[in-house]
Amino acid sequence: MAEITVGQLAQQTNKEVDALLKQLKSFGIEKSSEKDTLTPTEMKTLLEKINSAKNTATRKKVTSVKLDGKHKINVSVKRKRRVAKKVEQQESTTLEQPQELETMVQEVSQQVDIVKEQDNIEQIVENKEAVKVQEQRQAEIAKPVIKDSGFKITAMPEIKIEEIVAEDDEGLAASDKQAKKKAAKKVFSEAVNTNTKYKREEEEKKSKAKKAGGKGFKKANPRQLSQLAGDLESFDEFGAKKGKLKAPKVKKQEFTKPVENTVRTVEIHEGITVSELAQKMAVKGAEIVKVLFNMGVMATINQSLDQDTAILIVEEMGHKYTLHNENALEEAVTIVDRSSYKKISRAPVVTIMGHVDHGKTSLLDYIRQTRVVAGEAGGITQHIGAYSVKTDKGSITFLDTPGHEAFTSMRARGAKSTDIVILVVAADDGVMPQTEEAIQHAKAARVPIVVAVNKIDKPEADPDKVISELAQRNVIPESWGGDVMFVNVSAKTGEGVADLLEAVLLQSEVLELEAFAEGLAEGVVIESRLEKGRGPVATVLVQNGNLKQGDNILCGTEYGRVRAMHNDLGKKIKAAGPATPVEILGLSGVPAAGDEMVVIENEKKAKELAAQRSQKQKEAKIAQEQSLKLSNMFNNMGKEGEQQVLKIILKGDVQGSVEAIRESLLKLSTDEVKVDIIASGIGAITSSDVTLAVASTAVVIGFNVRADSAAKKLAETDGVEFRYYNIIYDLIDDVKKAMSGLLSPEMKEQIIGIAEVREVYRSSKFGSIAGCMVIEGVVKRTNPIRVLRNNVVIYEGTLESLKRFKDDASEVKKGLECGIGVKNYNDVREGDQIEVFEVIEVAKEL
């Protein structure tokens, strides 16, 4: 057996060096440090000691005893600590002290050393006659043990003296080992001739030695060392046994790294699936399904979860969570920190609105001293024009719109681009339908109005008529005690234009308009188009910051780099400040009017945000198509205080019909639901009505009018539904239904029949059967009933049977006799009344 150090033995047996040194000392092997080596003889002694003590720890022993030469009896003896003492007292042949065992083991080892050099050791083996004598003695002693014992012997104390199963050293011969075994057997048999128990055990040693044959020692291997480790583990540091030894198991020497529970931070977005959540927590989907099941939720791995449920799961499994902010990218990119910049006063942005041919563009043309009208088809504005005008008292930015449609479109997209509205009204024409619509849009956006009464140079001009008509539309002039400035102008002669500009600048001073002139630019798209050879072209109004050529910009769902900029005069510029309209090139597509324009430092982020906005826009469009239908309108009614509001846009063929319908609908308003007609007018439903409906979440109603082609196309795009009527009462009834849809229906009981009990019969199948006469209404088999006695309800339930003569009947009418069986009730008496009723829903009415 190769030499091994104490440290190596401690490492292979997974024991501390100090504990191993104490055990070696208790076995008579003196070692002082882990570097000391163990010789083959010491290793052999160590194995003998361990195996010897190991055998004495056996708690159960089964002994086979021959009774008459043919039959055998198995004696099973179990020994516990408290029982062992009694057995030792009762049996005089039992070994008295464990120290005797140690003495015998020492004698055996001495004899092994003595006979090591002898050559004729094999002649010492006992003959067969001695073996027979021993068997007879065993049988004689075993009989009285079985006969006289006052308790059942389930285990016999056993102390194994020798069982050398050590591994050998390469230098020892097999014959020497066999000689040692046989010499030990002889010495021990002579020492215990007076003890029957040890004779039996010595017999077992002989049989085992014969089976072992001439096997020699082999080199120790890791399995045997691990077995040695298991043996050493059964002793404490003083060499005493710890407890019952089990069969030695092969111990693999390996190192298991301690692993702490990993706490993960899980990002939860709305609609996360079970499989996605499992992947983020690095667990199997079945574990999350199990947690959901314990929470009372049946789910599959592909099922979507709301954020609250996902949070509960993450916390239940010991992880942390963060909620995914869908607008995180947009907030990080679009929100600009301007805390270090100072605000400066800026020019007002003025939108000119009014009816067709009332002189909007002519007035602006005179102000700019250019001939823009000549370039427009038919003298009517086709596109939005944005112009910056310098005056002696400051600059003004004008937006010339085609009517008011673009203004509405911008408001529908949440863009607040206009500061002041100039309402142009022809003095010879007065207030027209588009004039009223312009007033409605300006008030909806809460923008101050300055009225320009145009064409006062004409002989038929009547400014007072214009003032009177506008006052009827709640546009009260300052001369009448209102807050609206009226200025008489002539776009042809230029009369009053200076006063108009002064009124606009005065209004802007009241508003105290300010903006940041530094930092990344922000603005709004006024108009956009696709030009041949230039690509997408967008007219942008800068609202904050400084827009420079080469900036990366994001406009709604479109992005790009500013490749060129032109001002309102068509000249190339390199930068533009607040309240400056510019024309830019370089976008990926044509943005929509009213889209916000922001400058982003990273072009990659701009592209990513544009794709995200496009996806959100598609989802919002699908949801909007359903929300704008009249049938679901009560689900989307806005609240003003505690009232719910139904918004309506009303268009009719004549003014009288529109006024009549308007008054009728306003009278429908109650404390719970209010009708708000946000716009009304004469003529066909136009695209401006559609954009206003989208912006205000209103329903469009047409009385004897239809929508034009442009409005139909826009309505199809935005998912707006038109409702056409030619009878006023049908229109009012439908609006009533839309308003009543929010009110929950009432449940009402209605008595449909009464039957009087004339006689009571007994039935083996139904119990008490009441012979009745229907005295009122009709008795139906399926309806609930009440039993009345002296006009007091004593039972409420259902009918079990209803018969007319011997036939089953579904109903029995007034004046006919019938047999009635009441379910689960047998105390029916003569003179009782059976009342049949039904529960109906009654819708609340306004």
UniProtKB/Swiss-Prot annotation:
Residues the entry annotates as binding GTP: 354-361, 400-404, 454-457
PANTHER family, sorted: TR-TYPE G DOMAIN-CONTAINING PROTEIN, TRANSLATION INITIATION FACTOR IF-2-RELATED
Gene: infB
Function: One of the essential components for the initiation of protein synthesis. Protects formylmethionyl-tRNA from spontaneous hydrolysis and promotes its binding to the 30S ribosomal subunits. Also involved in the hydrolysis of GTP during the formation of the 70S ribosomal complex.
All copies of domain tr-type G, residue ranges: 345-512
Region annotated G3, chain positions: 400-403
SUPFAM superfamilies (alphabetical): Initiation factor IF2/eIF5b, domain 3 (SSF52156), P-loop containing nucleoside triphosphate hydrolases (SSF52540), Putative DNA-binding domain (SSF46955), Translation proteins (SSF50447)
Residue segments, region Disordered: 198-219
Positions of region (G1): 354-361
Assigned GO CC terms: cytosol
Cellular location(s): Cytoplasm
Protein name, as recorded: Translation initiation factor IF-2
Keyword Cytoplasm: yes
Region feature (G4): 454-457
GO molecular function terms attached to this record: GTP binding; GTPase activity; translation initiation factor activity
Family: Belongs to the TRAFAC class translation factor GTPase superfamily. Classic translation factor GTPase family. IF-2 subfamily.
Organism whose genome encodes this protein: Francisella tularensis subsp. mediasiatica (strain FSC147)
Tree of life domain: Bacteria
UniProtKB keywords: Cytoplasm, GTP-binding, Initiation factor, Nucleotide-binding, Protein biosynthesis
A family per Pfam: EF-G_D2
